Amino acid sequence: MILCDSDIELWMDEEKLDIIPRPPIERINGASVDILLGDKFRVFRGHTTAFVDLSGPKKNVTDAINLIMSNEIQLTEDDTFFLHPGELALAVTMESITLPNNLIGWLDGRSSLARLGLMVHITAQRIDPGWQGKIVLEIYNAGKLPLGLRPGMLIAALSFELLSGPASRPYHKRESAKYCYQQGAVASRIDQD
């Protein structure tokens, strides 16, 4: 069962679902909550790496990721981040989300942005029960023109689905929870698999 707008508000009122800062009622729709783009980004820097061997030794994978990813870029609210056609960047939501053990979240991009070529997530649309932290967005410009993105703009929507029971292995209690509590545009940690 997907939570409707009044249930989303009730779950937040009862502190079962935590979204900080709490969205105003205007951003809580029939079955979703509109979320905002945060102020932290990472991009692929200019490099001469021919490929990243994801099946290679972990140290080599770590070194390759560190070589190709920029340090975190933090914008002010007046700054604009330009994403050019064919470019991928990591960004973060403004909101920090905490899900209880019996609720899963789903991230969807906005249709208005998709119609301009902006993909908000490549494959990572599921937010596991027990999640705590900001959500990293894998944003890609599939359009023909550069797109200017600003912190605080509407970027995506979250919906919430009730599980048949509480998860016995919620995200924040798993040893493999390598992105739990993230607050910035965290680069891939595939080397920790």
Swiss-Prot record:
User: What InterPro entries does its record include?
Assistant: dCTP_deaminase, dUTPase-like_sf, dUTPase_trimeric
Example of a GO biological process term: dUMP biosynthetic process
- Pfam families given in the database record: DCD
Q: Which domain of life is it from?
A: Bacteria
| Enzyme class (EC, first level) | hydrolase
| Amino acids binding dCTP | 110-115, 128, 136-138, 171, 178, 182
GO MF term list = dCTP deaminase activity; nucleotide binding
Q: Which UniProt keywords apply?
A: Hydrolase, Nucleotide metabolism, Nucleotide-binding
Q: Where along the chain is the active site annotated?
A: 138 (proton donor/acceptor)
Q: Which Gene3D superfamilies match?
A: 2.70.40.10
* The keyword Transmembrane helix belongs to this UniProt entry's keyword annotation: no
Does the UniProt entry include the keyword Hydrolase? yes
Query: Which chemical reaction does it catalyze?
Result: dCTP + H2O + H(+) = dUTP + NH4(+)
EC no. given is 3.5.4.13
Q: In which pathway does it act?
A: Pyrimidine metabolism; dUMP biosynthesis; dUMP from dCTP (dUTP route): step 1/2
UniProt function note: Catalyzes the deamination of dCTP to dUTP.
Subunit-level organization = Homotrimer.
HAMAP family hit by this protein: dCTP_deaminase
Q: Which protein family is named in the record?
A: Belongs to the dCTP deaminase family.
Protein name, entry field: dCTP deaminase
What is the gene name? dcd
